[in-house]
């Protein structure tokens, strides 16, 4: 299934007002196989049956424990879609994945992608915004839908100064590299402490996210509090599980960041439900990631136990 908030947008939740389904846009999905990969046999049946206008691939894992999809895997998925349903467009939700590998999905047949500028592509500097990239006609179609026909991307909400977008985009590859180094260190340390982590420190990475599975809510919540405590902003604030729009379960979030809501910076969040997995993102600098995660582990695994 799509991640929680997308289920609301599509119209899979009880309230349908303003959703894609209410607007007459049909939706179907193919459950993943037991390994978290694509069930190509079932996907072929659905593609031939529906001949969809757009096939959506979510690169990152969202609030799931499957592996995020690499660019090579997306390349294979795209070739499969184009073979079975040649008229279908392929769209990739590229959030958390930009600059994590040498190549991007649009280099391998993906028609267009989108992502957030308060994640990888904004380099930790952009204050807000998102991007759409791909075939010119599709980008223009998105702009027309966002504003109005005849206006398109010539108008729209933006900041008075574009400096943050340009500088952030320039720094994004380096900042993403720092974040990935921080996650590799975190995975190695937390696995040594007995935590189940995915991906493991030595496994290939295609995004910023490090999943830590605690199996009990108490450790998950306490570790989240330690992430907040070791953040540069609002380190005195104590996160607690709370109801959030778009989610069925309570969610806990640690995000003591310079840019509100930024997951390019050191942060962690997750729904309070089994297997009590926390999704951690690091961070603007490897130096801070290493200090913060070491402090969090020290407090959770040593000081709590005397």
Curated annotation (Swiss-Prot):
Record Pfam families: Met_gamma_lyase
Top-level taxon in the UniProt lineage: Bacteria
Matches recorded under PANTHER family: CYS OR MET METABOLISM PYRIDOXAL-PHOSPHATE-DEPENDENT ENZYME
Family: To L.delbrueckii similar ORF in glnA 5'region.
Name of the featured protein: Uncharacterized 33.9 kDa protein in glnA 5'region
Native source organism of the sequence: Lactobacillus delbrueckii subsp. bulgaricus
């Amino acid at each position: 299934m799509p991640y929680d908030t997308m289920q609301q947008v599509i119209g899979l939740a009880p309230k349908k007002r303003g959703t894609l389904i209410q607007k007459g846009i049909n939706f179907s999905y193919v459950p993943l196989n037991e390994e978290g990969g694509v069930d190509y046999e079932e996907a072929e049946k659905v593609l031939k049956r529906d001949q969809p206008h757009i096939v959506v691939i979510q690169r990152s894992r969202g609030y799931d424990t499957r592996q995020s999809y690499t660019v090579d895997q997306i390349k294979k998925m795209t070739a499969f879609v184009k073979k079975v349903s040649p008229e279908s467009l392929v769209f990739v939700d590229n959030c958390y994945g930009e600059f994590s590998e040498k190549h991007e999905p649009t280099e391998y047949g993906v028609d267009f992608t989108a992502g957030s500028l308060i994640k990888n592509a904004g380099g930790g500097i952009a204050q807000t915004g998102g991007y759409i990239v791909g075939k010119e006609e599709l980008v223009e179609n998105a702009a027309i839908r966002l504003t109005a026909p005849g206006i398109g991307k010539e108008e729209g909400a933006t900041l008075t100064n574009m400096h943050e977008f340009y500088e952030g985009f320039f720094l994004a590859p380096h900042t993403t590299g720092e974040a990935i180094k921080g996650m590799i260190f975190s995975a190695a340390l937390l696995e040594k402490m007995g935590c189940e982590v995915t991906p493991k420190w030595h496994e290939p990475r295609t995004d910023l996210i490090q999943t830590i599975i605690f199996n009990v809510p108490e450790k998950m919540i306490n570790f989240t509090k330690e992430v907040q405590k070791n953040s540069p902003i609002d380190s005195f604030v104590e996160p607690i599980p709370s109801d959030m729009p778009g989610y069925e379960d309570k969610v806990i979030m640690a995000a003591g960041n310079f840019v509100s809501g930024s997951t390019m910076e050191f942060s962690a969040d997750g729904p309070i439900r089994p297997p009590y997995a926390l999704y951690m993102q690091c961070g603007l600098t490897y130096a801070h990631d290493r200090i913060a995660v070491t402090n969090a582990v020290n407090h959770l695994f040593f000081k709590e136990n005397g």
